[in-house]
Design a protein with these regions (language model features):
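Alpha-helix C-terminal capping/helix-to-coil transition sites in glycosyltransferase folds
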Residues: 9-10, 55-59, 79
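Redox-cofactor binding/interface segments in oxidoreductases and associated redox assembly factors
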Residues: 15, 61-62, 85
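Short phosphate-binding/catalytic loops that engage adenosine nucleotides
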Residues: 38, 81, 103
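Hydrophobic, well-ordered beta-alpha structural blocks that scaffold small-molecule cofactor pockets
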Residues: 1-44, 51
Length: 121
């Protein structure tokens, strides 16, 4: 399992959630990552699937309703290093799926990770 510090040392993030609504955390996380020089892909409102991303993904950030999140994760054919589950995006089904498939994850907030560990890449 990666620590938040290790996660923030990665380069490419996929944010799952409503990244077009300025009032939503997914939007704030996407903007924060971009401002710190990370490569960011937005899935949910901008892209429909993680599989649409041609580049390799380091981190997937779940900032989306758990029902939509589990669907996107199950459809994902891409390799990645870790998933960050934002508060409110977790469910027993997601945790069980990740554990059964040996997918590394942490529960946490990338906004806090940005504040504590991000350096301009």
């Amino acid at each position: 399992m990666m620590t938040m510090k290790e996660i923030m040392s990665q380069k490419t993030f996929a944010v799952l959630g409503n990244t077009l609504d300025e009032t939503k955390y997914a939007y704030k996380i996407k903007q924060g990552l971009l401002e710190h020089g990370y490569t960011v892909y937005a899935v949910g409102k901008e892209l429909n699937s993680l599989n649409e991303i041609e580049e390799e993904i380091d981190i997937i950030d779940l900032c989306i309703h758990p029902v939509k999140g589990i669907k996107l994760l199950k459809e994902c054919e891409k390799n990645f290093k870790c998933i960050v589950i934002q508060p409110g995006a977790e469910s027993e089904e997601i945790i069980q799926y990740l554990q059964e498939n040996n997918i590394p994850y942490i529960e946490g907030c990338l906004l806090i990770g940005l504040r504590e560990y991000a350096e301009n890449n």
